């Protein structure tokens, strides 16, 4: 007797998936997906490109489009039939106005293009060479730092936003090396400051 009660109470439950199945539906269901937004056509109205989705549906599946327009409210249908082509064009123009430019880049301040080289004393008889101004010629400082470290077989590091420190006294050789590696840096734009204190 208890088995009969549990079976009958299970059939009356609202959340039972067996009761939610439609009797007139043919399983497995065939769902039509939109070619514009890739969602089922019932959900196209929730996407930002409703006009494009409707145009695609009308062009490719006129029967389904007719069903959807009959099911829609008269306000939506009237809005679409009045200016279907112009509404889509207006939406497209609005989107182009809103998003096209992206982030505006700030103009760089015109800084004189000058490379300065200085020899800075460290402890006892040791020196470091400071190279400033390579960034004004749009030279990648990390690449320049690696190049100097490899060329002079020493340590080099990028310390400031436009400053490279090379361990050792290379003020004599570095001018020729810079002009050889980066020909856009001419002899007039390189200035040797000599020995400078930190």
UniProtKB/Swiss-Prot annotation:
Residues 115-182 form the SUI1 domain. The modification Phosphoserine is found at residues 20, 73, 189. The modification N-acetylalanine is found at residue 2. GO terms for cellular component: cytoplasm. Residues 72-110 are annotated as: Disordered. The modification Phosphothreonine is found at residue 86. Pfam families: DENR_N, SUI1. Induction: Up-regulated with increasing cell-density by HNRNPD. Up-regulated in ovarian and breast cancer cells by ERBB2 overexpression. Not induced by TGFB1. Gene3D superfamilies: SUI1-like domain. It is found in: Cytoplasm. One of its GO terms (biological process) is formation of translation preinitiation complex. Interacts with MCTS1 (via PUA domain); the complex regulates translation reinitiation. Belongs to the DENR family. This is Density-regulated protein. The gene is DENR.
């Amino acid at each position: 007797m208890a088995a009969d009660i549990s079976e009958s109470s299970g059939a009356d439950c609202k959340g039972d998936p067996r009761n939610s199945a439609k009797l007139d539906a043919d399983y497995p269901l065939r769902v039509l997906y939109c070619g514009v937004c890739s969602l089922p056509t019932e959900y196209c109205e929730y996407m930002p490109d409703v006009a494009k989705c409707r145009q695609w549906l009308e062009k490719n599946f006129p029967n389904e489009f007719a069903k959807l327009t009959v099911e829609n409210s008269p306000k939506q249908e009237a809005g679409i039939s009045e200016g279907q082509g112009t509404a889509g064009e207006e939406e497209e123009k609005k989107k182009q106005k809103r998003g096209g430019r992206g982030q505006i880049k700030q103009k760089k301040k015109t800084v004189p293009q000058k490379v300065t080289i200085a020899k800075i004393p460290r402890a006892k008889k040791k020196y470091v060479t400071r190279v400033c101004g390579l960034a004004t010629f749009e030279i990648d400082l990390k690449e320049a730092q690696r190049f100097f470290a490899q060329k002079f077989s020493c340590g080099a590091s990028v310390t400031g936003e436009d400053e490279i420190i090379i361990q050792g006294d290379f003020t004599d050789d570095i001018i020729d090396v810079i002009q050889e590696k980066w020909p856009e840096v001419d002899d007039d734009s390189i200035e040797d400051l000599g020995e400078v204190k930190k």
